[in-house]
Amino acid sequence: MSSAQDPFYIVKEEIQDSIDKLQSTFHKWERISPDMGDQAHVAKELVATCGSIEWQVDELEKAITVAAKDPSWYGIDEAELEKRRRWTSNARTQVRNVKSGVLAGKVSSGAGHASEVRRELMRMPNSGEASRYDQYGGRDDDGFVQSESDRQMLLIKQQDEELDELSKSVQRIGGVGLTIHDELVAQERIIDELDTEMDSTKNRLEFVQKKVGMVMKKAGAKGQMMMICFLLVLFIILFVLVFLT
């Protein structure tokens, strides 16, 4: 089965896309000022999204475990199985890193540092500009706060849109994952039924062989010769009917 047709790679691509969006949203979340009340809301949604992606990775690992029981049936080898295990492990690590970063409250210091410098400059105007600061400082500060607030709100809006899209992607992956799981279970059931049928057929053949052996033994040498002759005549008749008519 090619990679384009393999359900594993379809789900893998969806999950990787979700992880990329999650990391992008996380990096934007790091730049949100802690003073913004929406930071906690976005953090909560990030953690929830991490949990959803981890669930998808769990389902994919279950599918790998099922495929590992009979790789030849699914057209894969041990090297491919190991490759898939490494990918799921790496995906889980990426999600765990984002989740740990959110829970630890690690935010970049860029915006905070800029605000601190701004406040220092406001508190320490030079003597030549003191009067101008008294006149316009408050207005500049209000404008800066408003601009910073607008930037933060725009950033939060973008994150909400990305989280909504990420949630839809996770739901879509969940549906595909469940479909794959159901298909694997159905195939495993078919294999079990085939094994049972083969065992039953084998038992019937052994029974027939024993019966034939008993009949041959009871018939003796003369009876065996007569049976062989009968089978030979029957074979000749069938040959004539099939190939000469």
From Swiss-Prot:
CDD domains: SNARE_NTD_AtSYP61-like (cd21445), SNARE_Qc (cd15841). Disruption phenotype: Abnormally branched root pattern. Hypersensitivity to inhibition by Na(+), K(+) and Li(+) but not Cs(+). Abnormal PIP2-7 trafficking and subcellular localization leading to a reduced levels at the plasma membrane and abnormal accumulation in globular or lenticular structures. The chain crosses the membrane at residues 225-245. Residues 1-224 are cytoplasmic. The keyword ATP-binding does not apply. It is a single-pass type IV membrane protein. One of its GO terms (biological process) is intracellular protein transport. Induction: Not induced by osmotic stress or ABA treatment. One of its GO terms (cellular component) is trans-Golgi network membrane. GO terms for molecular function: SNAP receptor activity. It holds the Pfam family STX6_10_61_N. Residues 153-215 form the t-SNARE coiled-coil homology domain. The exact location of the SYP51/SYP61 complex is unclear, but is probably on the trans-Golgi network because of the likelihood of containing chiefly VTI12. Interacts with VTI12 and either SYP41, SYP42 or SYP51 in the trans-Golgi network or with VTI11 and SYP51 in the prevacuolar compartment to form t-SNARE complexes. Core constituent of the SNARE complex required for membrane fusion at the trans-Golgi network. Also observed in the SYP121-complex and cellulose synthases. Colocalizes with PIP2-7 and SYP121 in trafficking vesicles and at the plasma membrane. Interacts with SYP121 and PIP2-7. Belongs to the syntaxin family. This is Syntaxin-61. The gene is SYP61.
